[in-house]
């Protein structure tokens, strides 16, 4: 599922990108932008856009749009929002259009529904789930991208990243932002003191956890208050263990959650989740810990943090940046270990979708599909683009360059976050569906069969029937 920072998906599997953060993913994280004047996103601000403007260069021709106005909605906040506004400012500088950023709330489909019902839909929205794109199409809100945007997609994106933005073979989404959700971040000093090394396999991870525990530090921090973190844990184990074909089938509910492959994945997860002393605060504490705190508590307290390791995507760097820890020295990362034959790499992302068709809206999604837009935000940090023509040098540190290189190298060989492909009622609603069922499982990891039954019941209701 998406993160509170970004946010997280195609029909092909990620095996090749297991090298995602191999070796010492080093160097300190460059700060992600600063205070941006929320009231000004027009051309007068664009000359101040760090990393933007003329230095980025131009690879796409945009029309003159003087006198036009556009509204762009997304759930992004903080530095992520401020940095995206700099991208919008560059679009304004080059076209003359006045662009306003509209802060949205999760779930964004509900937010957009209220705006549309009130007769005030934004021109473009950034949607964090393929399921949301499908819903927007089914509700007849979304408009297909035009020839110019399609040309940029064909030139700059792998077929897999194009396909995940399609509904019934028609292109509606332009994936502007990606996430690598197969990473485990760790407190370097805590592992060093325990004499532990970066694990390559699940068995190695269990050994590392025991070494850390024996040294007097709790092994894992889990942000269980946000159910999407638990779906991400499950998806990585399931993809590596059951394989891409089964992953696709479960994502589409073509096999049931009572399938033996789900039992195997839950049983594997229980090897960690059932050990109360392995989780910061135990299961109850984990269920009260939101994602941002699960990261920051891993990197505060020096070599005696509340936990030594925290699982989540590349976007965790933003939260690490809120501590005194430096990425690459105090905070390091390794790929999610192989549970089966190969290590998983699960991806996520946010797609731009047109809600009010116009020359200006089409020009904006064309710009967002170009390297020009992504390069601006890449330079600012805390961002990953699926655009293969964004230069690696645009990323501000070696950690992000390595992750970006692995994402692009995987081409079409990757899998999109499973819960983000599901109907919102099952895969994207706090306190319901998969989020709630896995929270209950974290509380009682011995009840594998009961968890499977609840997951299947909720999935069947959300997908509109059994498999």
Give each language-model segment a name.
Residues 28-31:
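C-terminal motif of bacterial Sec signal peptides marking the signal peptidase cleavage site
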Residues 52-64, 130-182, 332:
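Hinge/lid segment of periplasmic solute-binding proteins
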Residues 89, 312-384:
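Extracytoplasmic/periplasmic substrate-recognition and gating elements
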Residues 89-157, 164, 192-200, 306-309, ...:
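Extracytoplasmic "Venus flytrap"/periplasmic binding protein-like
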Residues 115, 122-123, 153-189, 218-221, ...:
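A structural signal for short loop-to-beta-strand junctions that line the ligand-binding cleft
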Residues 136-140, 161-200, 225-250, 346-352, ...:
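Periplasmic solute-binding protein
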Residues 244-322:
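Extracytoplasmic ligand-binding clamshell segments of periplasmic binding protein
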Residues 383-385, 389-390, 404-460:
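C-terminal capping/gating helix-and-loop segments adjacent to ligand/active sites or protein-protein/ligand interfaces
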């Amino acid at each position: 599922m998406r993160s509170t920072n970004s946010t997280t998906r195609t029909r092909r599997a990620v095996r090749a990108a297991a090298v995602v953060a191999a070796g010492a993913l080093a160097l300190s994280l460059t700060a992600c932008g600063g205070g941006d004047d929320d009231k000004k996103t027009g051309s007068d601000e664009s000359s101040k856009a760090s990393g933007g403007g003329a230095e980025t260069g131009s690879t796409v021709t945009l029309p003159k749009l003087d006198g036009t106005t556009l509204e762009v909605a997304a759930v992004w906040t903080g530095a992520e929002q401020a940095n995206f506004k700099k991208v919008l400012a560059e679009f304004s500088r080059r076209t003359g259009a006045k662009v306003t950023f509209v802060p949205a709330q999760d779930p964004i489909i509900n937010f957009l529904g209220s705006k549309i019902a009130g007769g005030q839909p934004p021109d473009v929205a950034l949607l964090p789930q393929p399921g949301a794109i499908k819903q927007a199409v089914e509700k007849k809100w979304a408009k297909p991208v035009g020839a110019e945007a399609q040309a940029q997609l064909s030139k700059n994106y792998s077929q897999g990243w194009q396909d995940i933005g399609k509904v019934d073979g028609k292109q509606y989404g332009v994936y502007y932002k990606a996430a690598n959700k197969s990473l485990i971040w760790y407190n370097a000093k805590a592992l060093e003191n325990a004499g532990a090394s970066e694990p390559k396999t699940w068995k190695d991870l269990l050994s590392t956890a025991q070494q850390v525990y024996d040294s007097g530090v709790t092994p894992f921090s889990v942000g269980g208050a946000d159910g999407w973190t638990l779906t991400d844990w499950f998806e990585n184990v399931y993809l590596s263990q059951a394989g891409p074909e089964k992953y696709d089938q479960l994502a589409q509910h073509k096999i049931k959650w009572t399938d033996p492959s789900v039992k195997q994945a839950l049983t594997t997860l229980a090897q960690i989740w059932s050990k109360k002393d392995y989780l910061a605060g135990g299961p109850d504490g984990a269920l009260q810990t939101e994602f941002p705190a699960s990261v920051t508590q891993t990197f505060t307290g020096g070599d005696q943090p509340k936990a030594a390791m925290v699982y989540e995507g590349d976007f965790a760097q933003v939260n690490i940046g809120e501590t005194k820890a430096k990425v690459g020295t105090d905070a390091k990362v390794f790929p999610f270990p192989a549970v089966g034959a190969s290590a998983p790499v699960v991806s996520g992302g946010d797609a731009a979708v047109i809600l009010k068709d116009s020359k200006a809206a089409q020009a904006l999604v064309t710009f967002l599909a170009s390297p020009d837009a992504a390069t601006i935000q890449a330079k600012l940090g805390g961002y990953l683009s699926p655009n293969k023509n964004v230069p690696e040098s645009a990323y501000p540190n070696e950690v992000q360059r390595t992750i970006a290189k692995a994402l692009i190298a995987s081409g079409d060989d990757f899998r999109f976050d499973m819960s983000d492909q599901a109907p919102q009622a099952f895969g994207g609603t706090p306190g319901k569906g998969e989020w709630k069922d896995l929270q209950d499982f974290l509380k009682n990891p011995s009840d594998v069969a009961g968890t499977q039954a609840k997951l299947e019941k909720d999935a069947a209701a959300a997908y509109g029937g059994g498999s």
